[in-house]
């Protein structure tokens, strides 16, 4: 006697149903408020261990990504290594008058 298989194999094509997709309107993000001094402004350095402590320099750029020392300042005079720029935190610079 031969056993019959009870499994049925039907090869059917998948049905392509039309789908209605509804997307909500994207909310435009408010522009982020810029932090720090403006580029080109003069700032006084408040970091005591800096070569340029209490001196005035010009802001080259301010990084808005949230790094620790976002303010790049360029000075007229150079330090012992011949460097004229340095990075400072927002609380280490104040606008010069």
Swiss-Prot record:
Sorted UniProt keywords: Chloroplast, Membrane, Photosynthesis, Photosystem I, Plastid, Thylakoid, Transit peptide
Presequence extent in this chain: 1-24
Pfam families, per database record: PSI_PsaE
Protein's membrane topology: Peripheral membrane protein
Any one of the GO CC terms: chloroplast thylakoid membrane
Claim: Plastid is one of the keywords in the record: yes
Location relative to the cell: Plastid, Chloroplast thylakoid membrane
GO BP of this protein: photosynthesis
Signal sequence interval, chain numbering: none
InterPro entries assigned to the protein according to its UniProt record, in alphabetical order: Elect_transpt_acc-like_dom_sf, PSI_PsaE
Family named by the database record: Belongs to the PsaE family.
Subunit structure: Interacts with ALB3.1, which is essential for its insertion into thylakoid membrane.
Function: Stabilizes the interaction between PsaC and the PSI core, assists the docking of the ferredoxin to PSI and interacts with ferredoxin-NADP oxidoreductase.
Protein's name in the database: Photosystem I reaction center subunit IV, chloroplastic
Organism of derivation: Chlamydomonas reinhardtii (Chlamydomonas smithii)
């Amino acid at each position: 006697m031969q056993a019959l298989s009870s499994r049925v194999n039907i090869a059917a094509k998948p049905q392509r149903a039309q789908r209605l997709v509804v997307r909500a309107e994207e909310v435009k993000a408010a522009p982020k408020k810029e932090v720090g001094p403006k580029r080109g402004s003069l700032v006084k350095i408040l970091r005591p261990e800096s070569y340029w402590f209490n001196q005035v320099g010009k802001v080259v750029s301010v990084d808005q990504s949230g790094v620790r020392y976002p303010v790049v300042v360029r000075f007229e005079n150079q330090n012992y290594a011949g460097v004229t720029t340095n990075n400072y935190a927002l609380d280490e610079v104040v606008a010069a008058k």
